[in-house]
């Protein structure tokens, strides 16, 4: 599952590996906040593999990187000694790992529940892939009040804001929000059932 690649990298259009850092799909200001949080992390968990993965792998203070994705071909391009990667088969996908149909809808919840399967407790979780509200709910069960939870595209996507029943906002930068777990009286089973198949 884990293969070695000792250099910083990004991918060329032909699929080759170059020894250059891959930049996350964020603004410069968002990247500054992202880096600040990861500089304080040792065990990092992310929903959605990409430029954020490259940043995490290049942090000497981070000893383990867990990355979940729905695009097998994309995920297989990422290899590093401290990378633990998991592919969730949600069926055929288009850009950004979005399933094109519901042929494997029964597998969709495996994406958000993947965080239940690790033995480590992450100190940073980044939610930037599919099923983001469902991922936020499942993350809540697997972190403590000191864990940093980052969600991208949060500010402009109001359906993500229901997660504020579970988390407090520590800070925001444009579309990136940093959250911390809080006590909640919400019916989490009902909430999860509503969002477990929501690909947004």
Residue positions per predicted region:
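Conserved phosphate-coordination/catalytic loops
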Residues: 21-28, 47, 102-105, 130
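C-terminal substrate-binding/active-site "lid" region of AdoMet-derived donor-dependent transferases
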Residues: 124, 130-200
């Amino acid at each position: 599952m884990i293969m070695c690649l000792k250099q910083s990298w990004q991918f060329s259009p032909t699929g080759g590996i170059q020894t250059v850092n891959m930049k996350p799909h964020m603004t410069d200001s968002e990247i500054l906040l992202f880096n600040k949080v990861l500089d304080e992390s040792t065990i990092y968990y992310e929903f959605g593999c990409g430029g954020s993965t490259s940043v995490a792998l290049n942090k000497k203070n981070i000893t383990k990187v867990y990355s979940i994705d729905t695009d097998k071909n994309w995920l297989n391009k990422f290899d590093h000694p401290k990378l633990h990667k998991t592919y969730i088969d949600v069926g055929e996908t288009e850009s950004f790992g979005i399933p094109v149909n519901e042929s494997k809808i029964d597998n969709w919840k495996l994406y958000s529940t993947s965080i239940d399967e690790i033995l480590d407790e992450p100190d940073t979780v980044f939610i930037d892939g599919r099923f983001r509200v469902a991922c936020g709910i499942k993350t809540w069960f697997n972190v403590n009040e000191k864990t940093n939870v980052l969600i991208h595209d949060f500010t402009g996507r109001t359906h993500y804001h229901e997660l504020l029943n579970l988390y407090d906002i520590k800070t925001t930068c444009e579309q990136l929000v940093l959250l911390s777990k809080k006590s909640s009286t919400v019916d989490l089973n009902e909430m999860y059932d509503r969002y477990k198949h929501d690909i947004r």
